[in-house]
Amino acid sequence: MTQKNGADRPDDYKRFSSLDKEYDFQQSIRSNTETESVNTETQTHNKENKNDTTDVAGKYFEPSDYKGSTQLEKGLAETHEQVSDDYFEGTIDQNLD
């Protein structure tokens, strides 16, 4: 006996098939020229801000962060600890070269 839940019910199929008939599947073909012009505008904008995105956090981990008092220093120290733990657990011999 099959279960009658979710999209297995005949009523759901009828409901969803009527939505498919109303949906315009050709809309992506007609709006191609509009999206191309939008993409070129955003590409120009991204090139202007490229230097802003290369420096993600503005600060890198330093060993003194373990004794730090700010939230950023504590977060960097905790993240560094988690990454180094995962790295050692992920190696076969658990040793660095």
From Swiss-Prot:
Basic and acidic residues bias spans: 1-24, 44-53
Domain of life: Bacteria
Feature: compositional bias, Low complexity: 31-43
Sequence segments annotated as region (Disordered): 1-97
Pfam families: DUF4025
Name listed for the protein in its UniProt record: Uncharacterized protein YozQ
Species annotation: Bacillus subtilis (strain 168)
Gene assigned in the entry: yozQ
